[in-house]
Amino acid sequence: MSQPMTVDCPTCGAPVEWGEKSPFRPFCSDRCKLIDLGAWAAEEHKIAGAEESEDELYSGDLEPRH
């Protein structure tokens, strides 16, 4: 029988078995999952792409408010 696949937790680096026994996969725990979510919410992680400011995206689309 082959060994189960393992991955490293993206937050702490601990080995995580990829299977039903690991409900938080790819994270090792709920704590590591929430740390990662907090980093996304704080904009510490970003998806690569062109840098565009919000003003450039919507500058001509909306009427000014008075």
From Swiss-Prot:
Gene3D superfamilies: Erythroid Transcription Factor GATA-1, subunit A. One of its GO terms (biological process) is regulation of DNA-templated transcription. It comes from the Bacteria. Residues 45-66 are annotated as: Disordered. Keywords: Metal-binding, Zinc. The keyword Zinc applies. Pfam families: YacG. InterPro entries: DNA_gyrase_inhibitor_YacG, Znf_NHR/GATA. Transmembrane segments: none annotated. Its cofactor is Zn(2+). GO terms for molecular function: DNA topoisomerase type II (double strand cut, ATP-hydrolyzing) inhibitor activity; zinc ion binding. Binds 1 zinc ion. Zn(2+) binds at C9, C12, C28, C32. Interacts with GyrB. Inhibits all the catalytic activities of DNA gyrase by preventing its interaction with DNA. Acts by binding directly to the C-terminal domain of GyrB, which probably disrupts DNA binding by the gyrase. HAMAP family: DNA_gyrase_inhibitor_YacG (MF_00649). Belongs to the DNA gyrase inhibitor YacG family. This is DNA gyrase inhibitor YacG. It comes from Pseudomonas entomophila (strain L48). The lineage of its organism: Bacteria, Pseudomonadati, Pseudomonadota, Gammaproteobacteria, Pseudomonadales.
